Amino acid sequence: MSKASALLAGLTGAALVAAHGHVSHIVVNGVYYRNYDPTTDWYQPNPPTVIGWTAADQDNGFVEPNSFGTPDIICHKSATPGGGHATVAAGDKINIVWTPEWPESHIGPVIDYLAACNGDCETVDKSSLRWFKIDGAGYDKAAGRWAADALRANGNSWLVQIPSDLKAGNYVLRHEIIALHGAQSPNGAQAYPQCINLRVTGGGSNLPSGVAGTSLYKATDPGILFNPYVSSPDYTVPGPALIAGAASSIAQSTSVATATGTATVPGGGGANPTATTTAATSAAPSTTLRTTTTSAAQTTAPPSGDVQTKYGQCGGNGWTGPTVCAPGSSCSVLNEWYSQCL
């Protein structure tokens, strides 16, 4: 499909389709960096140069377990490297902010990996990247909630720390939520990998070994094929073990942006951060960003009454919300607790 055709299709469904989400930006040391926006940037002939990887997830969709052995699981569907990077120091904390609000029903783990690029990340072959896990939070029995719940409570954001002893160099940060609301059934889990280019300064000499992205998970792993609806579940976060000295997560908080940065391109530089009067993030949840919504004319009459958007919940035990799906999708039963517009 050409981009022109895809743009027409995207605009036609813009008022109806609202899937799960993507990372909108990061905040590090008070500086806001814009990420790739698959819902708008993909359609632009000259999209902005950003730190995030380009991916063909215009519907804010996911990678299914049947594709975990393919390159799509590395940095999302048909992903290509971002055109620039952000500079951080070893030991820095990065606030990763999602949009739109992560669905309450989409419970599951939050996982972060790094991979050394051994050169410019902007031109790296994604199949050559070897990923090591720097955090991975699943179900917290003491708190009685999933990591995705903690992300929602933290202003729809996640705080991750770059290892303080990490060797300086260029790295890709792979941040991911795995939604388990349909994981009781084969091929029911939903992975949302997001990749961001970083240049890490300072640090030490630690460069952990890693695994290829296509080897991170299997569709039958205990943390992928899993019933999350049991009381106080015993859950194993999928993927390789955490690197030595890493914790499953750090204490979560949001970060206030006091300046706006731009992506640095190889051999050049991004603009110096400029002060901003609007906080990109603040204590839960008050991200303030200007957005523009375009609604295309309806070519067919929508169903009457409450209509659930594509990928939204449309049924399940105790469900009292919409049961009619937007045009182009139908209500599919994933298990007795959850039905989804697909």
UniProtKB/Swiss-Prot annotation:
GO biological process: cellulose catabolic process
Reaction catalysis annotation: [(1->4)-beta-D-glucosyl]n+m + reduced acceptor + O2 = 4-dehydro-beta-D-glucosyl-[(1->4)-beta-D-glucosyl]n-1 + [(1->4)-beta-D-glucosyl]m + acceptor + H2O
Cofactor binding note of this UniProt entry: Binds 1 copper ion per subunit.
pH dependence: Optimum pH is 8.0.
UniProt cross-references to SUPFAM superfamilies, sorted A to Z: Cellulose-binding domain
Activity control: The presence of lignin presents a significant source of antioxidants, which probably increase the activity by trapping liberated oxidized fragments.
Subcellular location: Secreted
One GO cellular component, as annotated: extracellular region
Signal sequence interval, chain numbering: 1-19
Annotated PROSITE patterns: CBM1_1, CBM1_2
Domain notes per entry: Has a modular structure: an endo-beta-1,4-glucanase catalytic module at the N-terminus, a linker rich in serines and threonines, and a C-terminal carbohydrate-binding module (CBM). The CBM domain is essential for binding to and subsequent oxidative degradation of polysaccharide substrate.
Record function comment: Lytic polysaccharide monooxygenase (LPMO) that depolymerizes crystalline and amorphous polysaccharides via the oxidation of scissile alpha- or beta-(1-4)-glycosidic bonds, yielding C1 or C4 oxidation products. Catalysis by LPMOs requires the reduction of the active-site copper from Cu(II) to Cu(I) by a reducing agent and H(2)O(2) or O(2) as a cosubstrate. Hydrolyzes weakly barley beta-glucan, carboxymethyl cellulose, lichenan, wheat arabinoxylan and birchwood xylan.
Protein name, as recorded: AA9 family lytic polysaccharide monooxygenase H
